């Protein structure tokens, strides 16, 4: 990843959904090797903010600007957004799912083994997604982060359904990503123990 100059700037951002103001006046900046943890009650706008950053939700007001990345690609094309729901095709095997992501999203020419090993899924490679447990499905969704390297990770409750060992594995991957100059914005109710991570609490329509 060539991320040494990567910088994300959010200015006076607002979000409205279904005629309801979710948040407004939100501003922050984030640089390479930095993580921002979003907290706040349900409905405060954590998921909406992540979707705005990923380009999946319209910006009601304000600006989102990425500098230092690939000028030919949008923020969404330089980021992985992993939502709180796992969008997986039940009939595909674990390895087929990863190979699909590599083909569809583009990746360096290597096998899927690295991603499988990173998330502890190698022994399940040929198993159909339909037979996976909730925790295994979550790990498969997160394997996309490794299978197709991108500098920005946008994670919505990434630890949902994960046991303690899997959470530790994920945190190690997140620390490794930051160590290589990556950027992470994550909404979570769990203290991930990311040294130096900044906190942004959403609530009552504004960032506090």
Language-model segments: residues:
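Conserved ABC transporter NBD signature motif
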Residues: 59-77
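Q-loop/switch helix immediately C-terminal to the Walker
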Residues: 85, 90-106
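Conserved ABC ATPase "signature" region
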Residues: 99, 110-125
């Amino acid at each position: 990843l060539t991320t040494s100059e990567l910088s994300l700037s959010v200015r006076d951002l607002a979000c409205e959904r279904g005629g309801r103001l979710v948040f407004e006046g939100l501003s922050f900046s984030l640089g390479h090797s930095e993580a921002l943890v979003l907290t706040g009650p349900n409905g405060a706008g954590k998921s909406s903010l992540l979707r705005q950053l990923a380009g999946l939700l319209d910006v009601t007001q304000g600006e989102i600007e990425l500098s230092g990345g690939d000028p030919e690609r949008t923020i969404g094309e330089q980021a992985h957004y992993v939502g709180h729901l796992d969008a997986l095709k039940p009939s595909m095997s674990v390895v087929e799912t990863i190979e699909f992501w590599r083909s569809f999203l583009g990746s360096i020419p290597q096998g899927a083994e690295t991603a499988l090993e990173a998330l502890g899924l190698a022994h399940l490679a040929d198993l159909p997604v339909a037979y996976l447990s909730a925790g295994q499905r979550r790990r498969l969704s997160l394997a996309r982060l490794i299978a197709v390297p991108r500098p920005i990770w946008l994670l919505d409750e990434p630890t949902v359904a994960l046991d303690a060992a899997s959470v530790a594995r994920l945190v190690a991957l997140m620390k490794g990503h930051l160590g290589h100059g990556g950027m992470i914005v994550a909404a979570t109710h769990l203290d991930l123990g990311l040294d130096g991570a900044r906190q942004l609490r959403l609530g009552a329509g504004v960032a506090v």
